Regions:
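Long C-terminal interaction/binding lobes of large macromolecular proteins
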Residues: 1-239
């Protein structure tokens, strides 16, 4: 006699980028095991494969292309899947800014963490009086690299590669150049032609991009100094 099937609960959330409602389920034990093993391996390729497979498996709504979602959608989705899978509260250790040493444990309800949007954010970047550029958001691969890459901090070369991968098109009144028709080298050379003011506009795009954000109040137990801390990005909440 076969064993009974265990019912898996389903949940809904609204994607921050397009306000569409999607259905998802928690990790199964076998999926969580694969994810933990991949992260413990410190192999970025294994982590990439595991995270992709877990997110794709847990999203139940048809027609959702996970690879095409903006990075902040993926962060929000992954955080919610994790919350429904292993507990809807996470404890993180925050370094008290007044002494830079003391670790203060803080419990955060995952449903309180939202994607914050900046009113000054704009995907259209004006390069000069004639030329414009339209940006896209980092891909699923880039999201994984930012949150799980064990190689250390992002260097200048990686930063330029990230920027180049997010340029969707360059255009003026008469012509449009799609970067999908260009080589990586051509896009990188285009970037290197920019002056510092033009490049600052790109930095502003990334600096104002929607992101997971949550503000917490902490008290250093040693100095009794109170501090307000803004946590940003998935890695800040990954315990």
């Amino acid at each position: 006699m076969p064993l009974p099937k265990i019912a898996t609960p389903t949940y809904e959330l609204v994607l921050p980028s397009n306000k569409k409602t999607i259905k998802y389920r928690p990790f199964l034990v076998k999926e969580e095991k694969l994810l933990v093993l991949a992260i413990e391996s410190e192999d970025t390729k294994q982590i990439t494969t595991a995270v992709k497979n877990v997110i794709k498996s847990c999203v139940l709504t048809r027609g959702v292309k996970v690879e095409s979602l903006p990075s902040f959608d993926i962060e929000f989705l992954f955080l919610n899947i994790r919350g429904k899978s292993v507990g809807e509260e996470v404890e993180v250790n925050i370094t008290a800014p007044d002494d830079g040493v003391t670790q203060v444990p803080v419990k955060i309800a995952l449903d309180e963490i939202k994607v914050q949007e900046d009113e000054e954010h704009n995907k259209q970047i004006k390069l000069d009086d004639n030329l414009m550029m339209e940006m896209g958001y980092p891909s699923l691969d880039q999201f994984i690299s930012n949150n799980f890459d064990m190689d250390g901090e992002m260097n200048i070369e990686k930063s330029f590669e990230l920027i180049a991968s997010c340029i969707e098109k360059i255009y003026n009144q008469d012509e449009v150049w799609s970067t999908s028709d260009c080589t990586k080298k051509e896009v990188m050379e285009f970037l290197e032609q920019m002056n510092s003011l033009q490049f600052k506009e790109i930095e502003k795009f990334f600096g104002t991009m929607p992101k997971l954000s949550h503000t917490v109040e902490i008290v250093n137990p040693n100095t009794k100094v109170e501090s307000t801390i803004v946590l940003e990005g998935l890695s800040s909440f990954f315990a």
